[in-house]
Regions:
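Phosphate-binding glycine-rich loops and their immediate beta-loop-alpha structural context
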Residues: 127-242
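Short Gly/Thr/Asp-enriched flexible loops that form oxyanion-binding sites at enzyme active sites
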Residues: 249-261
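Solvent-exposed alpha-helices and their adjacent loops that cap or buttress functional pockets
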Residues: 50-52, 61-63, 80-84, 97-99, ...
Length: 397
């Protein structure tokens, strides 16, 4: 079977995905991390009126320099009265500008006396935040499909919006397979066993996307049990993610059970780690069959499953961020697969360097936990120390 480039696999997978557009409304305070279900435009100006950017004195610029009587005091949240000619208003940051004033003079530039203040010259408009200078009616604040951030919550609050229209979170069933797997916290390992890291790692990746996890646990290497579990997952979830059982071993039963109970494309991706990938459906529910090695499972989920899930959720998959970094390692990769090396990032600016996190084996989880990014190495490439390499930050995956 020919190797499939990652870009080709993504194009095929993403071309047919349809968004699940079930909508809900939630309180603004609970909306962070949710995917917005409608484009939101402003209906008012921010700020709603001219206000002071500083503590000081509101004046008509034509009246200064000179000594002026203080005619009123304007704290934030209180409506001013029109400024009397030839006077100054004591004003505080955020307070509305009195009609008749066109400048703010900083309090540290003023010489205060009993009921009067001596003020320097001022330019019209200085230290004034104009009405609508941040947001004007009709401005687009959030696009449909955008995943709401804490910054967005503040933005929407500033225009008084509450509640917010959002998409229902996808439900993603996560299951692993393998007689050798034991759950963390369940006791000591017996001979031949290892702890199951994939189930919890994949569930965490799903939750990080703002989606719900249906935990289907770990299945033994028994085809009937695996098949029955897949059908139960298909009935309960919007998508299924499995780890293990999609290679060509005698005990790799996930592949055969998907084929029996649905449809399957089995690809050999031209990436390392993460060559085997299954994508298809069970009883109409899409399924990703990821490799069993922990690093491979993590990376294929991040590179392949994540953009599909975001699009299915109604979101907007972003191009994978890459930035150039000087290599603090040397390596030759004569093969035919694009490689994603786990790298530690040190320094900043022109001194930023990427160094390998040790062994790059697909079973070495420390290579991921110690990494700040993935260095993308094209097939047939030799990298010398000091060469530029492209790095994908793990925080963006």
């Amino acid at each position: 079977m020919a190797l499939t480039p990652l870009s080709d696999a993504l194009e095929r997978i993403l071309s047919d995905v349809e968004a699940t557009l079930d909508c809900d409304t939630v309180a603004l305070e609970a909306a962070s991390g949710r995917y917005c279900a409608a484009t939101i435009n402003a209906t008012l100006s921010v700020p709603p009126a001219d206000n002071s950017a500083m503590d000081g004195y509101a004046v008509a610029s034509r009246d200064v320099p000179g000594a002026l009587t203080i005619s009123q005091r304007v704290p934030a949240g209180h409506a001013p009265v029109p400024l009397e000619a030839g006077t100054a208003a004591r004003i505080f940051t955020g307070a509305e500008i009195p009609a008749g004033a066109d400048a703010i003079i900083l309090q540290e530039d003023a010489g205060a006396g009993e009921g009067q203040v001596t003020l320097p010259a001022a330019q019209p408009g200085q230290h004034i935040r104009r009405r609508g200078s941040d947001i004007q009616p009709g401005d687009e604040l959030v696009a449909a499909g955008h995943r709401l951030t804490p910054q967005d919550i503040g933005l929407l609050a500033s225009v008084g919006l509450d509640p917010v229209p959002v998409f229902r979170p996808l439900s993603v069933a996560v299951l692993t397979t393998g007689d050798e797997l034991r759950e963390p916290g369940s006791g000591d390992l017996d001979p031949g066993q290892i702890f199951n890291s994939n189930r919890l790692s994949l569930a965490a990746q799903v939750r990080a996307l703002g989606m719900k996890v249906i935990d289907c646990g770990n299945l033994p290497d028994d085809p009937d049990q695996i098949g029955d579990a897949l059908e139960r997952a298909a009935a309960a979830a919007d998508c299924i993610v499995t780890a293990g059982g999609v290679s060509v071993g005698e005990e790799d039963h996930v592949k055969s059970q998907i084929e029996q109970r649905g449809a399957l494309d089995l690809w050999k991706l031209a990436i390392k780690p993460g060559k085997p990938l299954a994508f298809g459906h069970v009883a109409g529910t899409p399924i990703f069959g990821l490799p069993g090695n922990p690093v491979s499972a993590f990376i294929t989920f991040a590179l392949v499953a994540t953009p599909w899930l975001i699009k299915r959720q109604g979101g907007q998959p972003s191009p994978m961020q890459r930035f150039p970094v000087r290599a603090a390692f040397s390596i030759t990769r004569p093969g035919t697969r694009e490689e994603f090396l786990r790298v530690r990032l040190t320094g900043s600016g022109e001194t930023l360097r990427a160094s390998l996190t040790g062994s790059q084996s697909s079973g070495v989880m420390t290579s991921l936990s110690e990494a700040g990014g993935l260095a993308v190495i094209a097939p047939g490439t030799t990298v010398a120390e000091g060469d530029w390499v492209e790095v994908m930050p793990l925080s963006a995956l």
